[in-house]
Amino acid sequence: IDAQVPVGAKQARLTAMLYPTSIPTAVSLFMSVAPGVFRGTAGDYNLYGFANTASGATITNVNGSPMSYMHLASPNNAGQAIHVDALLTLVRPDASHFFGCKSTTSYFSGGDLLHAYYTNFMQNAAAGVALNILAFRFAGSFPWAADSYLHVEWL
């Protein structure tokens, strides 16, 4: 799955079919995004932070250290991971469903830590850091929860 969404687009839609059992190796999804709220099949998600690793831009974690990648874990199988080339955290406002994120050292979850990502993202954006490419790669087979369709919409 490959997709390009221009930064600053009034509205952009991306629908990705995520098979309930597994997805092929090396499937890639590329998006260019701006900070905002996204709508998924399981509810509304907030974009809390990412980095364009190709240009060297980074988002700092809550400890202040730069992160060049993270892992996304399925809510029904934390042992499986997706390698992420750029930072992304999607979480519903009520925090009832989210893609957990893993740094090089520890797992992050909960509203406070995720809010810190958003704060850092806005600070970096205000400082003029170019954040224009989000790229994450699915490696290997990955089991997903019941919502096998992920619909992302720029609002």
Q: For the regions a protein language model found, what residue spans apply to each?
A:
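Surface-exposed molecular-recognition determinants
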Residues: 1-155
